């Protein structure tokens, strides 16, 4: 069972993520567990103060490293101690899949001016959601919880669900539709209503390729493109030179008509 431990000054911010929706159901079924650790419980003063003024001066308060160390020591050893910080490496779907195969993840959620720099020695990994700054690490940690927990076997009702998600195939996800069949003049693509599973699969793959090309072309070099993908991308205006730069295979050769003789030229 995978356990998520969150070291925070505001456990009430994370409580809904731990008790509601699929994560809450997974906890009830014993598929995973979530522990909320209030770092104030490890302060050694009557006011439960966990921070102090920064050396060298400056605005704000800094969370003490000794408090964090005591809070971590109260937990069983973690496979990863993750510090949420704008300076960390960008969190990806690949990382989520890697983390889902562990048994215990501990998250350090900062506040105010952040942690004493020596907290980095307690972390095994530093993660960031992007190039922006939030008021604390709890929201970022909740995002990682959602991304990782859904990959734990049994958490999703349909085990194939996450395999078709954006990034799982290396591409953005294809568009999905449901009833009504028409809304404000926009209908559902006919191919999705025809019952031809091969045609639906081909349409979805092409839509994922088109979306990725338009919105995140940087993903294409690592998307595991096939010769058929290359052929479709050429119809979207991609050049053979671009395909070669991405490391994509060449499109399949046109099939020769049965009985046709090779052109001697």
UniProtKB/Swiss-Prot annotation:
Q: Which domain of life is it from?
A: Bacteria
Tell me which GO cellular component terms the UniProt record holds.
cytosol
Any S-S bridges, and between which cysteines?
none
UniProt: S-adenosyl-L-methionine binding residues:
110, 129-134
Which positions are tagged coiled coil? none
Q: Which GO terms describe its molecular function?
A: tRNA (guanine(37)-N1)-methyltransferase activity
Sorted alphabetically, the keyword list is:
Cytoplasm, Methyltransferase, S-adenosyl-L-methionine, Transferase, tRNA processing
- Pfam families the UniProt entry points to: tRNA_m1G_MT
Q: What is this enzyme's catalytic activity, as reactions?
A: guanosine(37) in tRNA + S-adenosyl-L-methionine = N(1)-methylguanosine(37) in tRNA + S-adenosyl-L-homocysteine + H(+)
The subcellular location is:
Cytoplasm
Q: What is its main location?
A: cytoplasm
Q: Where is the composition biased (Basic residues)?
A: 254-265
Q: Which EC number(s) does the record attach to this protein?
A: 2.1.1.228
The protein's enzyme class = transferase
- InterPro entries xrefs: Alpha/beta_knot_MTases, tRNA_m1G_MeTrfase_C_sf, tRNA_m1G_MeTrfase_TrmD, tRNA_m1G_MTases_N, tRNA_MeTrfase_TRMD/TRM10
Task: Name the family.
Answer: Belongs to the RNA methyltransferase TrmD family.
Chain's role: Specifically methylates guanosine-37 in various tRNAs.
Q: How does it assemble?
A: Homodimer.
Q: Provide the protein name.
A: tRNA (guanine-N(1)-)-methyltransferase
Q: Which organism is it from?
A: Deinococcus geothermalis (strain DSM 11300 / CIP 105573 / AG-3a)
Instruction: Give the taxonomic lineage as stored in the record.
Output: Bacteria, Thermotogati, Deinococcota, Deinococci, Deinococcales
